Amino acid sequence: MTMGWHTVMEFTPSLIGCVIASGNHSFELVRRSRECVINIPTTVLTDKVVGIGNISGAVVDKFEKFDLTSAPAQHVKAPLIADCFANLECKLADGRLIEKYNFFVFEVVKAYVARRPKYPETLHYTGDGVFMVSGKIISRRAQFKPEML
């Protein structure tokens, strides 16, 4: 499944919230297993990201169709996509909003990040088939007050 939207909800523990459409094949798989892997691609995988989002895993093996490399996860049953820049193994932390809003709250239990590139060109979906690419880095580290988070 290609995820169109997610949000960081907390840093300790690391919580991520996302909406998964109830008609999506992944919705029931994730709801039943109470776990998933969030794979973070770079622009190199743009066409594969779109293709993955346009077909259901109920009718095709997406790893095979899109020539993706799977890797075993340590804490969840779902595989990692080794082709991605980062992978987040997640377990359901709060399911109270699933029935009403299809909103899942996951705790990241293990994270993997490639050492290079230091600042990858990651994709950010803006809607209607349009993506924004990360790029320019702006630092305000000297002014940042982490205690205010």
What are these regions (language model features)?
Residues 1-149:
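Basic, polyanion-binding surface patches
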